[in-house]
Structure formats: C-alpha cells, structure tokens
C-alpha cells in the first residue's frame, strides 16, 4: 500500500473556548498539514480526543475533514475499542466511500491474552470492507501485541496491511520488520524513534509532531526513506526537543499549543485533559518561532 508510506498525521479535534467543535479551525489545520507535505490523514484517532466526542460530533469531524481534504490525500478512519462486537458492527455499517483504510487499536482495559487479541482482530479483518492498519500502543491499552501475534495476523489476513507500532521499543519493531510479509507496513507510532525505525526498514509514521511541524517532519521521513541519513538526522535533532515537549503534559495538549502559537486554533482540550501550563506554553511558543526563522 504505497499510499501509507511516509508521514500520516493524527488530526486533532480543535475546540472553541466553550468546548464546542471548531470546524473552521479544523479546516485550517487540514490545509496546513497538506500544504506541509504529509502523505495521508488519520481521522478520529487518539489525538482527536475521540473518547470525549459524542457520535454526532464524530460525524461532524468526519464530514469537515472529508470536505476540507477534497480528495487530495488518502484518509484513514480510527475504529477500535474493547467491545469486539461493537467494533464489528461499526465496520459493517459505516460508509467507507471516502476512506482508504481503518486504523484499529488493540483492545484496552480488558487486558486480553495474545489469543484474545488475535481473535479480536480476526473478527475485525473479516468484518472490514477496506484495509486495516493494526495499532499497538501498550502504554494506553495495558496489553502489548507481541510480534508473534502481529505476524500471525499479517499472514492469516491479507486485508491487515500494516501496524502502527507505538510500544516505543526499537527491538520489537525490528522483530516485526524481520518477520513480516513483503508488503506488510511497519509504521512508527512514536515520533522520537521514527527515523531509527525507518532506517531499520519501517514504512514511515503516524505522527503528532508531524501535525505541528509538517514541513520539517515529513521531509525528515522522506530523507530517511531515501537513505539520506545525515540530512535526515539533522532534522531529527532539530525537532527532538519539541517531541519531548508536546508529550510532556499530555497529548494533544502540547500540539494544540503549537496550533495556538501558529494562529490556527485555540489550545482548548476537554477534561480529563487540561491545557499546558504557562512554562510549557512559553517554551513551545519560543521553539515554534525559532523553527520558522
């Protein structure tokens, strides 16, 4: 799936000061990241604060992004959860005509075994009418999809086309790359180790910092894929401090502060998240201004 090689960005849901969805700001952000050179957009992922959105708000976010994108880039829709039957039902009833793939997170909170994870994604694969990208983020789900489970799924179901690997473990990523079928994508879900993963054979990234600074981060990814290592690492180290900063007080609080600094949206997040404090706000604002010089 060539469409998902490079930089995908996990779009935020911008809110007004009254916490309502800011559709105009969302359109500005879509145009900003497309102009910045990213390869695809991820809709209603973790960074979208999807857990705090009503169903009507989710539909509004989808419609707004589809309209703003206007067919320019492939769209990936986040559909996942810890109720397998509910996930399957949405996969069977959702209109996917504007989407190229689904991003589906490993079940959280229930802490399933590896066999439970396999059976969950077996049902997801059988229900989905479009390709599926698995999503492993044990820091949020409390269960790690081991390489053996991922590779078993990849070999058994051809519409499972890749994984967003966000365990933060480069050795685990390399085991996936080593054992994967030829066309299976191993996509970084951790901005800090994206470049090392690419150089180890990874396919790219689904990024948060790449949404805040799309021009610089997507260029780093392209240089890595082209094996222009020295040039890629110049950009990696240029951006490294900002990656730490945007996750310092929660995601997407950090990247929303960048958008506020850029004049694209408010920095409003919904509880239980809170906006970054004044110290971090000042540091992100300074970094953003220095990067644009």
Curated annotation (Swiss-Prot):
Catalytic reactions on record: L-aspartate 4-semialdehyde + pyruvate = (2S,4S)-4-hydroxy-2,3,4,5-tetrahydrodipicolinate + H2O + H(+)
Protein's pathway: Amino-acid biosynthesis; L-lysine biosynthesis via DAP pathway; (S)-tetrahydrodipicolinate from L-aspartate: step 3/4
Site (Part of a proton relay during catalysis): 46, 109
InterPro entries: Aldolase_TIM (IPR013785), DapA (IPR005263), DapA-like (IPR002220), Schiff_base-form_aldolases_AS (IPR020625)
A Gene Ontology term for the protein's cellular component: cytosol
Keyword NADP recorded: no
Single GO term (MF): 4-hydroxy-tetrahydrodipicolinate synthase activity
Annotated function: Catalyzes the condensation of (S)-aspartate-beta-semialdehyde [(S)-ASA] and pyruvate to 4-hydroxy-tetrahydrodipicolinate (HTPA).
UniProt similarity note: Belongs to the DapA family.
Assembly information from the UniProt record: Homotetramer; dimer of dimers.
This protein's name: 4-hydroxy-tetrahydrodipicolinate synthase
């Amino acid at each position: 799936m060539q469409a998902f090689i490079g930089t995908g960005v996990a779009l935020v849901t911008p809110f007004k000061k009254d916490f309502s969805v800011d559709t105009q700001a969302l359109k500005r952000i879509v145009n900003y990241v497309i102009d910045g050179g990213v390869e695809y957009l991820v809709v209603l992922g973790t960074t979208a604060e999807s857990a705090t959105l009503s169903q009507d708000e989710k539909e509004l976010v989808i419609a707004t992004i589809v309209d703003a994108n206007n067919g320019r880039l492939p769209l990936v829709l986040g559909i996942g959860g810890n109720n397998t039957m509910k996930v399957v039902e949405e996969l069977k009833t959702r209109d996917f005509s504007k989407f190229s793939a689904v991003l589906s997170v490993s079940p959280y909170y229930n802490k399933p075994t590896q066999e439970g994870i396999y059976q969950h994604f077996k049902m997801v694969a059988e229900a989905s009418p479009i390709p599926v990208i698995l999503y492993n983020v044990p820091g949020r789900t409390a269960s790690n999809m081991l390489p053996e489970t991922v590779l078993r799924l990849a070999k058994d179901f051809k519409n499972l086309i890749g994984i967003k690997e966000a365990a933060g473990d480069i050795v685990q990523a390399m085991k996936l790359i080593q054992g994967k079928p030829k066309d299976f994508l191993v996509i970084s879900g951790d901005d800090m180790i994206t470049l090392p993963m690419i150089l180890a054979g990874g396919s790219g990234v689904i990024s948060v910092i790449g949404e805040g600074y799309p021009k610089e981060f997507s260029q780093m990814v392209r240089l890595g894929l082209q094996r222009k290592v020295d040039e890629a690492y110049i950009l990696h180290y240029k951006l490294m401090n900002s990656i730490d900063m945007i996750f310092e007080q929660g995601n997407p609080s950090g990247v929303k502060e960048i958008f506020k600094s850029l004049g694209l949206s408010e920095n409003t997040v919904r509880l239980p998240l809170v906006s970054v404090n004044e110290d971090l706000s000042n540091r992100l604002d300074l970094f953003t201004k220095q990067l644009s010089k």
